[in-house]
Amino acid sequence: MDIKEYNSKNMGKQVLVLKEKDIKDLMHFSTIAKNESIKGLIASGKYAGFTDTYRLAVVKDSNEELQGADTKIYSVSVLEELKKAKSMAVLKDGKLAIQVDDDVTEYDPIPDAKVPDIKLFINNYEYESYSSGKVVEKITDDIVWKMLKVVDSSDIKRYFCFEEGKLIVEAYPNGNSVLLLDVLELDNKKAKLKTTLNFKYMDLWLKYVKDEKFDIALAKNNRNACQFRKDNLFYIVMPVALRD
């Protein structure tokens, strides 16, 4: 349907709206939507995004006048349309509307699907300390970072150490040596946490933010998730377990 005709027929029916930039930002994390257990795009409250139970990437709708969506999930097939989308909206009846060029197509949510209420992970999760951070120059091109990213996390003990205004990766390839790698510069020198995060998950985030500043919320301990945020995009990552 043509965008002008569509808007005239659906005025006041939208409960969540994302613009082109927010959709593009979210699609950087679209691989999360293709996991075996929770496939697709989730809408919940003011948020839309993806989760695979180990991590969550969502964009917040900044239109304060909109009430937010009921928790729904849409087929993973909509991702191909979102790659080209100028905007998307969730309507009061639960339908997802995606605008590509000047045309709008509607998609029904997956019926009777078990869907995690992603807004609760954003609104109800508690953190210990906060900081802004910036990536050390070209860290994702560093040969040590690349090596740690491809090696099985159970084969090498490695920790993400937030301390004294830095994030340093501490890795133990064998019992006699340690690798130290500066990853982030932090504004809050009192922020402190030693945890284990998945390198591939963190690499995805670092390639998204590039050299721009972003916000960090650190977990209370190494068993809880950390949150990374830039503008309307939230990325929550659970720690991984290391083999003794």
Where in this protein do the model-derived segments appear?
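DNA polymerase processivity clamps
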Residues: 1-244
